[in-house]
């Protein structure tokens, strides 16, 4: 009895009728004739006893079509080897000229990275909707004289800026040409081959063409994201009626995820060369506008802003200085040195005050508030939270006074934001950005109990005297600060009693500002702390070299050795580890 669907001579496995015209297949792959298939009392296969329900009786039952393809299958099985070999040869011949000759060890292209729309807020306050498409462009190598089909990425952007009518509604198209990179590094060189900006307002298209003067960078590809680092800025000049308006694409490095869940500014600290920065020390008769890009010099968090800084120098007491990786202004007033940065936005209507690491700072050098952030704070975001200067006459109109004494006086008199308002703003921001909880910036001072609440668990504190007496332990931060004041020392050391491996975690709390600012989050107690003051120096007393890979969740900058932050972040860039930066008057910690 031949009952299988794959048999050459089909017969019904129930009535044994041969030469069936209509064959229905049951789940066990045995064949039955149409009359037997529709009989209501028959629901088991007589061969293997498998139950089935006819599709006519149950519309949800699987429809097994009765195809009689035994002869076709046999013919295919006999000739399968010959046909497969012929198809493979034809496929290789057809695809060979279209396959890009890219070494997979040098570059790994992202997959399915086409038509991904991602909403992104740049540090300049522009809203960008990215649409990336990928193609291939032939490139001739000078040494090998061969044509390589290198990836060509085109980025379509829609730029919106509520504060600048010129940028409103413009479409930006950027094309990047990828060239070869170092083997195994994952990075390859790239250059801008095409940049165009078109005004697409509803009132009618107004084509605006721009010329690209330069732009060479590096691109790193992975299967899920594309990262681009711009090594030189792209000055773009308008050739239309907007000839007076010049601007730069100052996004040096961006990271795009396929799903669009993570998109934030990122920067490598050492891609700018020193020759791009020159100090401004020449005497000036009045305010002068200086174009610069201010970004963070710590932790790889970029804050690339197109800003205008007012510079003025009177009797060698005030000067504007641009140093290496950051922009700083030192004001000497009565022997007291204050280090602030006054940056004016591109529209020239408002000031923004930044500290040296690119975070908005409000207050004096002893007290202040640093806003937590998920993305790098933009001028538009900062302007929405609070205003820096108190009196508007300092920033509007021709009577604007840009002297630093007046600005600092207004700045010192400015009342700080109330603690309840700051907490409410922080909690609201945390609720809206739960997935970025590890990318926070926190600031604590002596009276921080109401900020801490139940979120932060302080383990223990201890205070040491100058004469190295036995330290007193306490779990109350206020008591620890009182002990510090009583003993007359400016250094309070905190120690977690939890031992991890063969080390104990030590955290240095700075109290030199007189306020007793401190930090120690309980959720960081699961890792080790790398305190630079605890490193064993060399025999000659010099600072030791840092290890190649720092696998410590917390890095603390001490006063014993002067380490450049770039030396540390180089080893932690692309790693989900915490970095703690100790300044003279406040502490920050954030996630790279």
From Swiss-Prot:
<keyword id="KW-0175">Coiled coil</keyword>
<dbReference type="GO" id="GO:0008270">
    <property type="term" value="F:zinc ion binding"/>
</dbReference>
<protein>
    <recommendedName>
        <fullName>Putative RING finger protein ORF9</fullName>
    </recommendedName>
</protein>
<dbReference type="InterPro" id="IPR018957">
    <property type="entry name" value="Znf_C3HC4_RING-type"/>
</dbReference>
<keyword id="KW-0479">Metal-binding</keyword>
<feature type="zinc finger region" description="RING-type">
    <location>
        <begin position="12"/>
        <end position="49"/>
    </location>
</feature>
<feature type="coiled-coil region">
    <location>
        <begin position="414"/>
        <end position="441"/>
    </location>
</feature>
<dbReference type="InterPro" id="IPR001841">
    <property type="entry name" value="Znf_RING"/>
</dbReference>
<keyword id="KW-0862">Zinc</keyword>
<dbReference type="Pfam" id="PF00097">
    <property type="entry name" value="zf-C3HC4"/>
</dbReference>
<dbReference type="InterPro" id="IPR017907">
    <property type="entry name" value="Znf_RING_CS"/>
</dbReference>
<keyword id="KW-0863">Zinc-finger</keyword>
<dbReference type="InterPro" id="IPR013083">
    <property type="entry name" value="Znf_RING/FYVE/PHD"/>
</dbReference>
């Amino acid at each position: 009895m031949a009952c299988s669907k794959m048999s050459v001579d089909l017969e019904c496995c129930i009535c044994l009728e041969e030469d069936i015209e209509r064959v229905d297949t049951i789940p066990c792959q045995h064949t039955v004739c149409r009359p037997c298939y529709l009989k209501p009392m028959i629901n088991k296969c007589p061969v293997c006893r498998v139950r089935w329900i006819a599709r006519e009786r149950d519309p949800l039952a699987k429809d097994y079509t009765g195809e009689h393809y035994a002869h076709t299958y046999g013919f295919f099985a006999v000739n399968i080897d010959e046909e497969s070999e012929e198809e493979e040869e034809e496929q290789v011949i057809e695809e060979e000229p279209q396959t890009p000759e890219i070494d997979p060890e040098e570059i790994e292209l992202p997959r399915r990275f086409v038509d991904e729309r991602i909403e992104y807020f740049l540090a300049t306050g522009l809203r960008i909707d990215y649409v990336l498409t990928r193609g291939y462009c032939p490139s001739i190598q000078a040494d090998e004289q061969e044509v390589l089909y290198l990836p060509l990425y085109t980025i379509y952007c829609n730029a919106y800026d509520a504060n600048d009518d010129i940028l409103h509604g413009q479409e930006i198209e950027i094309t990047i040409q990828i060239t070869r990179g170092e083997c195994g590094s994952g990075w390859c060189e790239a250059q801008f081959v095409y940049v165009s900006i078109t005004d697409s307002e509803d009132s009618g298209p107004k084509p605006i063409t721009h010329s690209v003067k330069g732009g060479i960078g590096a691109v790193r590809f992975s299967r899920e994201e594309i990262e681009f680092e711009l090594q030189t800025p792209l000055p773009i000049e308008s050739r239309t009626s907007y000839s007076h308006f010049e601007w730069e694409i100052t996004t040096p490095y961006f990271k795009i995820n396929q799903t669009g869940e993570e998109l934030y500014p990122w920067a490598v600290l050492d891609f700018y060369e020193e020759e791009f920065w020159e100090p401004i020390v020449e005497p000036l008769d009045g305010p002068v506008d200086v174009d610069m890009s201010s970004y963070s010099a710590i932790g790889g968090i970029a804050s690339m802003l197109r800003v205008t800084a007012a510079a003025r120098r009177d009797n060698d007491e005030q000067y504007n200085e641009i140093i290496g990786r950051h922009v700083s202004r030192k004001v000497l007033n009565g022997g007291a040195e204050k280090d602030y940065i006054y940056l004016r936005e591109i529209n020239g209507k408002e000031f923004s005050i930044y500290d040296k690491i690119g975070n908005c700072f409000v207050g004096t050098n002893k007290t202040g508030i640093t806003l937590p952030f998920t993305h790098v704070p933009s001028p538009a975001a900062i302007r929405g939270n609070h205003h820096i200067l108190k009196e508007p006459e300092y920033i509007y109109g021709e009577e604007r006074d840009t002297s630093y004494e007046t600005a600092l006086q207004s700045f010192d008199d400015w009342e700080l934001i109330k603690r309840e308002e700051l907490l409410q703003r922080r909690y609201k921001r945390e609720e809206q950005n739960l997935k970025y909880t590890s990318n926070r910036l926190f600031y604590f001072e002596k009276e921080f109990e109401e900020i801490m609440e139940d979120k932060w668990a302080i383990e223990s504190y201890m205070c040491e005297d100058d004469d190295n007496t036995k330290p007193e332990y306490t779990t109350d931060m206020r008591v620890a600060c009182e002990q510090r004041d009583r003993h007359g020392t400016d250094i309070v050391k905190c120690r977690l009693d939890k031992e991890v491996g063969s080390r104990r975690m030590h955290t240095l709390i700075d109290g030199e500002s007189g306020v007793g600012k401190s930090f120690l989050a309980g959720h960081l107690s699961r890792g080790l702390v790398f305190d630079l003051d605890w490193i064993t120096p060399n025999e000659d007393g010099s600072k030791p070299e840092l290890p190649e890979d720092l696998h410590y969740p917390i890095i603390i900058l001490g006063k014993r050795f002067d380490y450049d932050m770039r030396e540390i972040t180089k080893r932690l860039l692309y790693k989900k580890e915490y970095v703690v930066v100790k300044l003279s008057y406040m502490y920050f910690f954030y996630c790279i």
